[in-house]
A protein has these predicted regions:
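Non-catalytic carbohydrate-binding regions of carbohydrate-active enzymes
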Residues: 68-141
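Short acidic, flexible loop segments centered on an aromatic residue
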Residues: 218-222
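Beta-strand signatures of extracellular beta-sandwich domains
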Residues: 216, 244-246
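Well-ordered alpha-helical segments within folded domains of soluble proteins
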Residues: 24, 43-60, 64, 69-74, ...
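Hydrophobic h-region of N-terminal signal peptides that target proteins for export
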Residues: 12-20
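Glycine- and aromatic-rich loop/turn segments at beta-sheet edges
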Residues: 26-49, 60, 77-93, 134-139
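C-terminal beta-rich recognition modules with glycine/proline-rich loops and embedded aromatic residues
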Residues: 23-40, 69, 119-209, 224-244, ...
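Bacterial N-terminal signal peptides that target proteins for export
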Residues: 1-7
Length: 354
């Protein structure tokens, strides 16, 4: 795998000089690093691009940024956020098209504002709703192809840049060579998110050692105890605690938290590493709906479906929850209802493959 990564990186460096690398927002000045400039190394379900190309090998990133306006942001707050489920889905008569539209809105609004809440929404859409449609059994359909295209487009917002430095928005095993008018560097992100919480980022390829740069890493709402929309969802289990950021094995002291991002501002040397261990224990969440309540299960950005479909969302689910791994090393959640019956829950994206 290590040799494969090195060979792929060499190919990436050769091809990047021939292709346009960024998609820019005119508002904040953020530029997304284009999907074609990012090599995704994940295996199985964490490899969003690989899953998408399994549907259609000809898929390439499309231009999905919408014209930004204050009206678009107001529409998001008024019409999108109140309808969001823990899966990121809003439902409706055409849930996949709605999800694709919401992903485009989230990408646009993040590029214009730099607020992590929009990448939180994109992450949930990608790993729950859209991945579920791609994984679903049965012949290829229009919705499956549409969802696959959206997964490819989603890999075009893993990284972004501005005049100050690098933004790491999504935690996906990947490598990219970032080249802007202000700086150049190679970013190697090593992780098995969203199944395991460790994220290691190695920076190389800077013009020199001691190169000053700001690196922003998203601290997701699901790790800071912020459920969206607020007032609709409440943690029953103890909410996760934001992890410590380590630089070269030492706690990062020169960090600032702003807009849902940890900002590490320092002079970087080639080979410097950032390490974060995100807590990914399963949590019970109370969901207020129609004057009543139900109980759901989340683990990081993943929404979970209970094997007993008749009991999904049943308020009688009781803690504590336990985690186990299946034959494919996917995290399953086990627990009991208040009446003592046992249940098993699996990631929502697998619930359409039965």
């Amino acid at each position: 795998m290590h040799l494969k990564r090195i060979a792929g990186l060499c190919l990436l460096l050769l091809t990047l000089s021939l292709s346009a690398q960024t998609h820019r927002s005119p508002e904040l000045g953020l530029r997304y690093v284009a999907a074609d400039s990012v090599v995704v190394w994940g295996e199985g379900y964490s490899d969003l691009r690989g899953m998408a190309l399994g549907v259609d090998t000809a898929l390439r990133e499309t231009a999905t940024l919408l014209p930004y306006s204050k009206r678009l942001q107001k529409d998001w707050l008024k019409h999108v956020v109140p309808q969001l489920a823990l899966s990121g889905c809003r439902g409706g008569t055409d849930p996949i098209q709605t999800a694709v539209t919401d992903l485009a809105k989230a990408k646009t609004l993040f590029a214009a504002t730099g607020q992590a809440q929009f990448m939180d929404a994109a992450e949930r859409l990608l790993f729950n709703v859209l991945l579920r449609e791609v994984v679903a059994s049965g012949p290829g359909s229009f919705d499956k192809h549409t969802a696959a295209q959206a997964l490819v487009d989603g890999t075009g917002c893993i990284y972004a840049t501005d005049g100050d430095g690098l933004w790491i928005n999504l935690f996906i095993n990947s490598t990219t060579h970032v080249k802007t008018a202000d700086f150049s560097l190679v970013v190697d992100q090593m992780t098995d998110m969203p199944f395991s919480g460790r994220v290691k980022v190695r920076l190389t390829g800077m013009p020199r050692n001691g190169f000053p740069l700001k690196v922003r890493l998203r601290m997701p709402g699901w790790v800071t105890g912020q459920l969206v929309p607020a007032g609709k969802y409440t943690y029953i289990s103890t909410p996760p605690v934001a992890p410590t950021v380590y630089i070269n094995g030492r706690e990062g002291l020169n960090t600032v938290f702003d807009g849902g991002y940890v900002i590490v501002s320092r002079a970087w040397n080639r080979g410097d590493e950032i390490l974060i261990d995100f807590p990914l224990s399963p949590c019970l969440v109370s969901h207020t709906v129609d004057g009543g309540s139900r109980t759901d299960i989340v683990r990081g950005p993943l929404f979970y479906a209970v094997a007993d479909s008749c009991a999904q969302g049943n308020a009688s689910i009781a803690g504590p929850l336990s985690e186990m791994r299946d034959a494919a090393d996917l995290p399953l959640v086990t627990g009991r209802y208040a009446d003592g019956r046992a249940f098993t829950a699996w990631p929502y994206f697998l619930s359409g493959s039965e």
